[in-house]
């Protein structure tokens, strides 16, 4: 099992997932974070676990308001991680590596968890907040899907606004056994 903070047996150079210009752009967006945000990792033993660990460290390194904790959870898919305002229950979950088209979904989830207001009409936000009942949505995505980010971002927005809504983005390629 791979844990956050664990050193690799070989001191190979970590591959950066993002280009320096992209990192600078994300860093500037993260300046809008008002409240501390946690990335809560449940990495398990699958091959992508170490890559997700490195990616989370890369993202957390862009703001002193973002921290990473390791919390193995038998109820969660592994490898996965959640985004939450520090001290609150996580409602936005990522089972896979949100890169490519899905990177924006992660950035927005972090911003919303950190208190940056969503860009949506107040009437829509009020309707989402007023939804009764508990909801847990799961979205299977592929990183080549051009429509998937819109769905993921809409459901993450709902989860950010209403504490009774949860959403999990699932990389279908990483969890093939669930979609076959």
Locate predicted features.
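Local sequence-structure signature of Cys/Sec-based thiol-disulfide redox active-site neighborhoods
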Residues: 16-58, 129-167
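Long, charged amphipathic helices and adjacent flexible linkers at domain junctions
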Residues: 116-131
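Thioredoxin-like thiol-disulfide oxidoreductase module
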Residues: 57-86, 164-180
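Acidic, proline-/serine-/threonine-rich low-complexity intrinsically disordered repeat tracts
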Residues: 11-12
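Charged, alpha-helix-enriched surfaces in structured cytosolic catalytic cores
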Residues: 21, 98-101, 150, 174
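N-terminal acidic, proline/glycine-rich, low-complexity intrinsically disordered segments
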Residues: 1-8
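Non-catalytic, surface beta->alpha helical segment in thiol-disulfide oxidoreductase systems
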Residues: 2, 83-118
């Amino acid at each position: 099992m791979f844990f956050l903070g664990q050193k690799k047996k070989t001191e190979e150079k970590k591959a950066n997932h993002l280009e320096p210009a992209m990192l600078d752009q994300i860093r500037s967006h993260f300046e809008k974070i008002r409240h501390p945000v946690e990335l809560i990792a449940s990495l398990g033993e699958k091959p992508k676990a170490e890559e997700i660990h490195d990616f989370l460290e890369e993202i957390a390194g862009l703001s002193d308001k973002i921290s990473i904790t390791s919390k193995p959870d038998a109820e969660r898919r592994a490898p996965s991680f959640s985004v939450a305002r520090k001290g609150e229950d996580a409602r936005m979950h990522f089972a896979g590596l949100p890169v490519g088209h899905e990177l924006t979904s992660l950035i927005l989830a972090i911003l919303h968890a950190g208190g940056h207001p969503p860009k949506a009409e107040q009437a829509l936000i009020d309707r989402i907040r007023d939804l009764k009942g508990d909801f847990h949505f799961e979205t299977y995505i592929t990183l080549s899907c051009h429509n998937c980010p819109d769905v993921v971002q809409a459901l993450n927005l709902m989860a950010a606004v209403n504490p009774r809504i949860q959403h999990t983005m699932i990389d279908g390629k990483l969890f093939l056994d669930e979609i076959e």
